[in-house]
C-alpha cells in the first residue's frame, strides 16, 4: 500500500479513485493532481513506481488536506457559533442549516427519536 499524506492508499484501485481516500481530495482534484504529476489516471496504484509516488506526494502537499482541513472547518464552524449568526445558532442547536423543513424529517441532524409520553386527559 502506498502511503500519501498519512493515509494508506488501496493498491487494487485506479489512481483517481484511490486518491479520494484522502480527506479533502475529490474526483476532480484527484484528476488535477495526477495530470500535474504526469501519471496516467487509469493506472492502478500497484503499478505506480517510486518516482511517480514522489511526484504525487509533492502535488498533494500543495493542498490543505486531512487534519489541517478538519481543523480549519471546525474553526470556521466555531466562529459562526461565536458570532451568533443564524447558521451558528442552528449548529449549536443541532438542526439543519440550509432551510430544510424540520417538522417531519431531518433525523440525521436531530439524532434518534425521543419518545414523549402522552398526557392523561382530565376527568370530569
Swiss-Prot record:
- Which GO terms of the molecular function aspect are on file? rRNA binding; structural constituent of ribosome; tRNA binding
Biased composition of type Basic residues is found at: 100-124
Recorded GO CC terms: cytosol; small ribosomal subunit
Which UniProt key words apply to this protein? Ribonucleoprotein, Ribosomal protein, RNA-binding, rRNA-binding, tRNA-binding
Which SUPFAM superfamilies does its entry note? S13-like H2TH domain
One GO-annotated biological process of the protein: translation
- Keyword Ribonucleoprotein belongs to the record: yes
Residues of the region (Disordered) are: 94-124
What does the UniProt record say this protein does? Answer: Located at the top of the head of the 30S subunit, it contacts several helices of the 16S rRNA. In the 70S ribosome it contacts the 23S rRNA (bridge B1a) and protein L5 of the 50S subunit (bridge B1b), connecting the 2 subunits; these bridges are implicated in subunit movement. Contacts the tRNAs in the A and P-sites.
Oligomeric form and interacting partners:
Part of the 30S ribosomal subunit. Forms a loose heterodimer with protein S19. Forms two bridges to the 50S subunit in the 70S ribosome.
Give the family per the record.
Belongs to the universal ribosomal protein uS13 family.
Q: Which NCBIfam families match?
A: uS13_bact (TIGR03631)
User: What is the recorded name of this protein?
Assistant: Small ribosomal subunit protein uS13
Provenance organism = Christiangramia forsetii (strain DSM 17595 / CGMCC 1.15422 / KT0803) (Gramella forsetii)
- This protein's gene is called rpsM
